């Protein structure tokens, strides 16, 4: 009997790839609590500085150059073995895709940095 596995991943799986989390000791919001407002759409739209910071952060983010870690690669092996049926992730770094997991098992709960857009203007 083949066992089927569903996995939920969060920031911890990607910190080893050099992507900072948000709330940990070296997290983005821990170091820059004033920047939490970029995740409030109304504040984001009202404050030009928040928008500029957000776009600059996205452009310079380590997400673009990060490589999948050991845990990402292990999840690919589980899928290849026919065991992984669902991979839900809170991460927006697309490292599961980069590692080789297929789109039919991945659910990006918050989207990905490459597909993000404004919920109001859709840009």
Regions picked out by a protein language model, each given a short descriptive name:
Residues 1-123:
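Conserved catalytic core of sirtuin-type NAD+-dependent deacylases
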